[in-house]
Amino acid sequence: MISMSMKTMLRGQIWLYSADPTVGDEIGKTRPAVIVSSNEMGTLRLKVIAPITVWNDVFDSVVWMVKVEPNSNNGLSKRSAIDTFQVRSVSQQRLIKQIGSLSDETMAEVSEALGIVLNVAN
């Protein structure tokens, strides 16, 4: 078994994430999530992630949802949405297994959506 300290977790990687237990309207269950924290943060045992959910056409008008088409690089099996409104810091222990990585172009869209959600300039 690989120890937590041996896992390399980088911005833009997609990991299976165990969200439970959740409270209220928090997105739950085991699902993909993208690491959005900067690699410059060093070896903290926490990562900032944005959960990924199945795409729904109503998300077309939602500025914080970033559409992702499945491909061999990202490891997703369905058209998906990165929910930047549900961004959170989580223990690396919640990140189970890397399944892929996002393109630089998609990460730029994620950064833009995070800027809107957090009201900060990119």
Question: Can you annotate each of these PLM segments?
Answer:
Residues 1-122:
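Conserved functional hotspots at enzyme active or ligand-binding sites that engage polyanionic ligands
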